[in-house]
Curated annotation (Swiss-Prot):
Record has Signal as a keyword: no
Gene Ontology cellular component list: cytoplasm; DNA-directed RNA polymerase complex
Enzyme Commission code(s) on record: 2.7.7.6
Species the sequence originates in: Saccharolobus shibatae (strain ATCC 51178 / DSM 5389 / JCM 8931 / NBRC 15437 / B12)
Record-linked InterPro entries: RBP11-like, RBP11-like_dimer, RNA_pol_Rpb11_13-16kDa_CS, Rpo11-like
Species classification: Archaea, Thermoproteota, Thermoprotei, Sulfolobales, Sulfolobaceae
Location of this chain's protein in the cell: Cytoplasm
Keywords: Cytoplasm, DNA-directed RNA polymerase, Nucleotidyltransferase, Transcription, Transferase
Reaction equation(s) it catalyzes: RNA(n) + a ribonucleoside 5'-triphosphate = RNA(n+1) + diphosphate
Annotated PANTHER family: DNA-DIRECTED RNA POLYMERASE I,II,III, DNA-DIRECTED RNA POLYMERASES I AND III SUBUNIT RPAC2
Pfam families named in the record: RNA_pol_L_2
Name by which UniProt lists this protein: DNA-directed RNA polymerase subunit Rpo11
Top enzyme class: transferase
Length: 92
């Protein structure tokens, strides 16, 4: 995975993430949209034959886009950890 900043402003961030597809894009954008202060979050895959997504984040200024992204990633990490613990606790 390689991440490139395509555009960065005080309330807008656009990233290119190489080596990823809709799986990560949908998870990140969906989580970002639940964060207070995020006005808009989306992603798209420029071409269906490439493993690359573009993520766009727009905030209302109460949170920096990079901070919103970090919060979204931490939320996903905690959620995944919770699911791992739940699955480990299942009995056969």
């Amino acid at each position: 995975m390689e991440i490139k900043i395509l555009k960065s402003e005080s309330n807008y961030l656009e990233l290119e993430i190489e080596g990823e597809d809709h799986t990560l894009g949908n998870l990140i954008a969906g989580t970002l949209r639940k964060i207070s202060g995020v006005s808009f979050a989306s992603y798209y895959q420029p071409h269906p034959l490439t493993d690359k997504i573009i993520v766009k984040i727009l905030t209302d200024g109460s949170i920096a886009p990079k901070d919103a992204l970090l919060k979204a990633i931490e939320t996903v990490r905690v959620m995944a950890s919770h699911y791992i613990d739940e699955i480990k606790g299942l009995t056969k």
